[in-house]
Amino acid sequence: DDFVLKTFAGKTFMDVFNAFYYSWSPAVAEAEYSNPALRETVKYMIYPLIGSLQLSRIAAEPLAAVSSELSVISAGVVVSNLLGIIYLAPISLLVRRFLLSRKRLPVTAPRLAWLMMVLLPILATAVYFQNGAVVAFASSALVLGGLCLGCALPYTIAKALASMRSR
């Protein structure tokens, strides 16, 4: 937390994240308190989150020598992709397999990667000029894009591998 909160981008994003998180987490905490099985489930589901946060920090640490802002933004991109892969991709693959097997979805990994590449200079410019509103928007959009990209990557990779095998 301290690593993130020492930067303008990190603090601004955490303000947005905390507003979102604390809008629903008290209800979950209350449900956990009265349900030991739910408490155990949540406990085990948090382990990958903690590991992802640690990995993203390790991956971004070398960039701190260049810029702490760049380091925090990189950590956010890494962790959002990892969380998309860990938490969203399995659900997405099941939904795609059983409910949307014949439909072509317009959201693809290359489009999401393009979106993230567009957001990065917007975020960098907003950080440079210390524009809190744009940083809040761009950092949140970047994290959501990273979650979606992480969600789309396993399907994209599996599809590419299947295509290579069929040649």
What positions do the PLM features span?
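Long, compositionally biased charged/polar accessory segments in the mid-to-C-terminal portions
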Residues: 1-167
